[in-house]
Design a protein with these regions (language model features):
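Secreted, disulfide-rich extracellular signaling modules
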Residues: 1-149
Length: 149
């Protein structure tokens, strides 16, 4: 299974504004946000992902299937042990999008990402979504295969 989600940016009404959109966004499980930065973690493409704004004005997170699978497994095992598990763990299926800055190290003219920090600079963007969304809904694209027997 492969899954992808894109978040369309809504352009500012003030194009000459000094406030720019975040260069990078981190997708991380809501319950893991504080420990992600406290423990200096990096996006691992399993439970956390990062992306930049692309040429079509979107932040696209590709192949998030491992995250979906981990969340589903946590719910499955949690519910097997405790029927009230989802009530006790209301964020089991929640992620946050957080602006980040990448720390890099350069060696022999090759830059390598050495860390991720919560972006504390002035940046802002508005993404399509929410209950009052006048735009097309956010779609999660899922591709999977199944063998016929």
């Amino acid at each position: 299974m492969a899954a992808k989600i894109s978040f369309q940016r809504i352009n500012s009404d003030y194009p000459n504004s000094a406030i720019k959109a975040p260069s990078y966004l981190l997708m991380v499980q809501k319950d893991s946000l504080s420990t992600f930065f406290e423990k200096n973690k990096m996006a691992n493409n399993v439970t956390s992902f990062y992306t930049s704004c692309n040429s079509t004005n979107e932040y696209t997170f590709s192949n998030i299937s491992s995250l979906i699978r981990k969340m589903s497994e946590a719910r499955k095992f949690g519910m097997a042990a405790d029927p009230d598990w989802t009530v006790k763990h209301p964020n089991w299926n929640k992620v946050l999008l957080v602006p980040i800055q990448l720390k890099t190290q350069t060696s022999s003219s090759t830059a390598t990402i050495s860390g991720m920090e919560h972006s504390v600079g002035i940046a802002s963007t508005k993404l399509v979504g929410g209950s009052e969304n006048p735009y097309a809904p956010i779609n999660v694209e899922i591709v999977y295969g199944k063998f016929n027997q």
